[in-house]
Amino acid sequence: MTKLFFTTALAMSALCLQAQTVVSLDKAGTLSEKISSAEKYEITNLKISGPLNGTDFILLRDMAGMDQENNKSNGTLETLDLTDASIVKGGEPYYVSYGGNADTEYYTSDNEMGHAMFIKCATLKDVKLPTTVTAIGDSCFLECKALSNLDIPASVKEIGSYALSYTALEKFSFPEGMAITEGVLYGCSSLASLTIPSDVTVIPRDAFSGTGIQEIELPKSLTKIGEEAFSASLITKVNCPESLLTIDTGAFSLCPNLTEVNFNNKLETIGNRAFSSCESLLEANIPNTVTTLGSSAFSTCSRLKKVHLPEGLTKIETALFDRCDKLEEVNIPETVTSIGALAFQNNGKLSSVTFPEGLKDIGKNAFKSCYTLEEIILPQSLDSLDVSCFDGCMNVVNIVLSPALKKIPRGAFSYCSSIEKIDIPEGVEVIGEMAFASCDELRTVKIPSTVTTLEKACFCDNWELVEVHCAALTPPTCGKNAFADMAEENVLYVPSGTKQAYETADTWSDFASIVEEETTDIKKNTVRSNVYETARYNIAGQSIGNDRNGIQIIKYSDGTSVKTVK
């Protein structure tokens, strides 16, 4: 009988602790007179009516697990009903932030849930705000990680930046007319339902980053989606409203479930990393209205197969499709003049690319390790390649270089292990370090008369290389190991009358055999009587002076033209 009574008493005691404590105040700053020090850590459910100021919120914060100076307390308050309360100016600072050379004190204002008022109050689960509140301040409920329900009255017209960030809210509906602020629901991983007002024009930075939302209806008035606005969320599909002009940096980056994006026909800007690491995205049909497509915008989209780039685009930015290893099809618009570094690096399924006439430069590692690419035909307009731009394109069997190139840079075509022949065009002056190194099947190389320098290891580790044709009348300067580890029975073909020079030149003298070959359609520059020169061009058709060396085309007053070498 005694045991039964004791058990019942314990149960009744627990029930009392869970029961709502009701406090009525006549004067702000007197909450501590109603709740004693002995009680404050025992109350889990509290309802307050009457005025509250900063002094009262010191106690409420303490009861909810965080003291005035943001140190953890033993508070256990889970449910707080302030429906019939009001917030008034006055009292002590409810929160003191220490930092740098100055401390910041936060005081209450009339009808406002203040800045960081309940920041990191980890025990709060259910809060009902006063019906007179008009604003919720920045970081008000930041990191209230147990807060799953928040009743916000219609009187609230503003919710501050990061006010509800890292809470456990499962659904949220912004009232019509309310602007969305930066990071307002950032990191709310439990948030599965979200309603955005129909008149919103901007979704700012971090607003819904890291949330659990899978579907969202974007308002028809929307013009901009800000930086990281939906990043790392669980969104599966995006339908861009016709009003949308800008998708900013990282707006949908790291969204692992995003499979479909329907762009509108007025979109102008897709920012840096906008869809980076969206590993389920399959296709990107970018409208022709887009004029700015930022760096890494679709990088590491590991399932992306098909892309349509907008006509009018002038530059493919850095790492735009870096590590999109399933990308099979992409167009490069005729208007593109520049392809940035890493633009298509590690696109393992990309078997063909058509480069437009007008393309001027290709950046560092731009097509590195595109190991199914079969052909590289560079336009005549291209005058600049950067380091390792086609390094590791193992299945390329045909390379056509541009006559506008002056230098083939370091590692540009190294490890292109299927290429058998390379014909370097007239106009190239320098072949860079390891430019054609480790091309396992390379057998024949033609070096033009304009080349003056071969940098170290430029043709090294080409074990099948048996035939090198060098048209330079003066042996080009060679760096260390320029032709190291080529076929043993190798032959160097040089212009008529230059064999002795090559036999005594460093590196060239190491060839097993040196053979002179007759040049065709090229004459030594000679003087003809009664005929004078009217124009002179280089091999690319550009007008030059008579002080230039190399292969030239000279027009004479009698109407004849002569291809000559000077």
Ranges and model annotations:
Residues 20-26, 44-52, 70-92, 99-111, ...:
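Structural signature of tandem-repeat unit edges
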Residues 536-558:
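Short, surface-exposed loop/turn motifs with a glycine/proline- and acidic-biased composition
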Residues 516-540:
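Residue-level detector of functionally pivotal "anchor" positions at catalytic/ligand-binding pockets or at interdomain
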Residues 115-117, 137-142, 160-163, 182-186, ...:
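Consensus positions within tandem repeat domains that build extended binding/scaffold surfaces
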Residues 1-21:
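Bacterial Sec-dependent N-terminal signal peptides
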Residues 503-521:
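A recurrent domain-boundary module in secreted/ectodomain proteins
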Residues 1-3, 551-566:
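C-terminal tail/sorting-segment detector
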Residues 30-39, 55-65, 162, 194, ...:
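Short, T/G/N/S-enriched strand-turn elements that build extracellular solenoid repeat scaffolds
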